[in-house]
């Protein structure tokens, strides 16, 4: 299948669920179609009405765990909500390629999720992002509503002259943390497709103690000393991890 046609089909499917604006849809479908061999990523924000939160969680567990069981090219699926505000939910998905996204969208478990809760989510936002860095433990991860997992979502703009330095420093810190810190489960860095110096850093921890350990580590402190002057508009949201699953073993660095 033609890659451009496949991309249009996938975006159309996502739009049907998320209800994003037609202008944004046009932007996504007409964007640069050059081949990107990096793993494909999706990032979304939803407002989940209080009365839907239980169903949203149970339907999400069924969808994401089935994906891990049946879709080898669906690499990572993560759902987390803002600490203290279960209505604000974030989803980060990582796939081997566009064909893997299409396979997931066509699956019975995804369609069941859409039918149960898709149209009831509000204030939806779809981020148009690409992979920069993806690091995971070698072993598969499965954290389901354990009440302890913590996810941080940090957003910032990188000085355009310092992108390589910032990427390298994050790479070194994430590689070390994944290797040496038992409670550091995964680190993902994404960038906006059409504003490549706008970055999102997602880091997954087993619990608050693991987050605190990482923030106080010499490696993290050294990284920040090297890059903090190159970052603007830094904001961090601390999220409670709801559903965090992956096959493990990702170690991607964008050239």
Give names to the regions the model predicted.
Residues 28-47, 65-68:
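N-terminal "mature head" segments of proteins
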Residues 25-38, 78-87, 112-150, 155-159, ...:
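Glycine-rich beta-strand-turn "strand-cap" elements at beta-sheet edges
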Residues 62-78, 94-128, 176-185, 204-240:
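An amphipathic, aromatic/His-enriched active-site/gating alpha helix that lines ligand/cofactor pockets
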Residues 11-21:
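Bacterial N-terminal signal peptides
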Residues 2-13:
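Bacterial N-terminal signal peptides that target proteins for export
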Residues 45-47, 92-94, 157, 202-204:
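Short hydrophobic/aromatic beta-strand micro-patches
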Residues 47-59, 157-167:
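Short, surface-exposed ligand-recognition loops at beta-strand->loop->(often short) alpha-helix junctions
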Residues 160-188:
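A mid-sequence, solvent-exposed acidic-amphipathic segment
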